Amino acid sequence: MRKTAEGAHLGTPRRIAGLRVVMSWPDSEFTPAPARPGAFRARLAAVAGAVLLAGGAITIAVALLAQQHAPQPSAAAAGATGPAAKGPSLHRSLPVSVDIPAIGVHSQLLHLGVTADGSIQVPSLTRSADEAAWFKYSATPGQIGASVIEGHVDSYQGPAVFFRLGALRPGDTIDVTLADGVTAIFRVTGVRQYLKEKFPAKTIYSAADYAALRLITCGGTFDYATGHYLSSTVVFASLTSSRGPGGPEKSS
């Protein structure tokens, strides 16, 4: 396992459609960085310990810790990784923003690619913890193929853009606004969690025969000994309809 300069935790290199893909996840041991995944809870844990030593109200600190656990996907939310039937698709247009009403997310979208060593870039924790990023070597949202958007779950400042991603359920909607003014409307088909050493990169990043969307963040248990999450949460969604600028919703 390796780390990027941004503190990304890297897995086994893979090649997908000629692209060398090294799965990366935000890590908590890079320097210098005032923000990192899970570190907010780690800092609260330190505060809790200090309160305990002082004989103070430890229950308050424990309550704060409990409140900062990101929602995890339930077995009922696993659903499917794709739709039952092929749906509509859109022409290529770069994504501008993403909205997820069920979990209160609105974010402008960064466009990120790969680093010099071929690993997938992640948003900067120091500057962009509250912004999601579209992987620019994936399909644009609404195109036939898999479009990938990633975001951090938390940082030193607390919950980040995809903190509540694991709370999504099949049927929830995801709206991606495109540069041409069209909004691509996706419906969640499933939410799954994978141990990072078993992350199915081919399933997530390889081409699909329908307009697919994948949202990715860290999830599962936070390992305080190593300073990173043990799993990744992945939301699978498919395009169901779209709206034009000022126009009605359409399904094709």
Feature locations, PLM:
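N-terminal membrane-targeting segments
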Residues: R2-A80
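Solvent-exposed, non-transmembrane regions of membrane-associated and secreted proteins
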Residues: T59-L168, L178-V182, G190-S252
